[in-house]
Amino acid sequence: MMPTPVILLKEGTDSSQGIPQLVSNISACQVIAEAVRTTLGPRGMDKLIVDGRGKATISNDGATILKLLDVVHPAAKTLVDIAKSQDAEVGDGTTSVTLLAAEFLKQVKPYVEEGLHPQIIIRAFRTATQLAVNKIKEIAVTVKKQDKVEQRKMLEKCAMTALSSKLISQQKVFFAKMVVDAVMMLDELLQLKMIGIKKVQGGALEESQLVAGVAFKKTFSYAGFEMQPKKYKNPKIALLNVELELKAEKDNAEIRVHTVEDYQAIVDAEWNILYDKLEKIHQSGAKVILSKLPIGDVATQYFADRDMFCAGRVPEEDLKRTMMACGGSIQTSVNALVPDVLGHCQVFEETQIGGERYNFFTGCPKAKTCTIILRGGAEQFMEETERSLHDAIMIVRRAIKNDSVVAGGGAIEMELSKYLRDYSRTIPGKQQLLIGAYAKALEIIPRQLCDNAGFDATNILNKLRARHAQGGMWYGVDINNENIADNFQAFVWEPAMVRINALTAASEAACLIVSVDETIKNPRSTVDPPAPSAGRGRGQARFH
């Protein structure tokens, strides 16, 4: 008698298991790596991505590209996630981390197909990653924080390495200095929010400037604004969340009036309430008034008569940065404008930049904050410049917190590859093969750098292996001369943290994908959305 089949999952559920499914997941990850492979390094290409709404983005940043790709494959999404985590944690190395994870999987694919147990692979990978991280820590060069000149030089070199693969690599010296200046202005916490980046179209890239303080675009202003002064020395600043304009009553207000005098009294009361607020602000001694809500024409003219400057509808993040820079606090009422809640700065002025007017607060006593004003042509170009600067800022922050650096340009990967290959020869069994595969996978970084620059990768990798075997541990790819060079002396430096993070994240992702032995897809997730129903009225649906 046949046993009754047990139906556990809903009809239409797609489940795949075993080795074919694991191989399929590995292949999906390699497809993701193919998407960003050519963007690696100073000779990397850029991608032009157009989203569903027709917005075009040109980018060289691995994390940005993967975010914009609408990836649906569950295993491939893991690689997108590690690129995002690398971007959030370190800022740079997003393409490297994706390539490494895909290459680790590619190297173990033959072993998986032959039926090697995934746990053996995972154990070997964890061992290899631990050895590699310890080796990086051992050979990384520490820069003394006490020596400010030396530290600054190190930070600029790290920023230049991060910028050399971006669109703005021609101006990397200019921007590296700007980024280091910006990060140096911050306090010990090094908060990223304290660096504002504002984009102004027009002008050349070299016209970009760093403002030691807060700067934001002039807000919409009413009549009477022209009469306000545009520059103050040591002004007090009131930060408000109060509406200073006459408006029709909200919430269906109803008033019954019997005489003209009653109506006049109501109108007078409205004016008096507004003038009372304005008088209190004037009495507080504040010279610059910023509000998140609108400041109307009556208030604008009132302030202009008293030599005060006002700006309404200031974006919340700009208001908060001003508060953190100039002190004071954002008030929701004007009844308690005591000196403690007012901020102050050394100079406030409004100046013209390109076609826009900007408000500048400089000499802020409280926090260390700054604003980078970017100039440039096309909008996409400026957005990519902003992303590039974000990467460089993150790198400099990391380098300040962890003051050790390694050589980039594939040098550290080649050294780790040699070290792990030597180590694998000292151990017997399957682990030897797997750690050897891990070591071979590390060579993808210098190989891809050569491929992207159009060099003969095999030839250069042979030279690198020979040089590393002789003890030249900082030798990497020399992009400018199609050769190998001591990248530490060529100042291609990266914070050791970037490499440690990339290796651990890539290894974890590879282990995660190898450890999946079954994929179950619920039918509901693959059903097409229902077609829109026929419209009513004139535009009736037609059926052919």
Curated annotation (Swiss-Prot):
Mg(2+) binds at D92. Its EC number is 3.6.1.-. ATP binds at G41, G93, S96, R398, G409, R499. GO terms for biological process: binding of sperm to zona pellucida; chaperone mediated protein folding independent of cofactor; positive regulation of telomere maintenance via telomerase; protein stabilization. Pfam families: Cpn60_TCP1 (PF00118). The modification N-acetylmethionine is found at M1. This is T-complex protein 1 subunit eta.
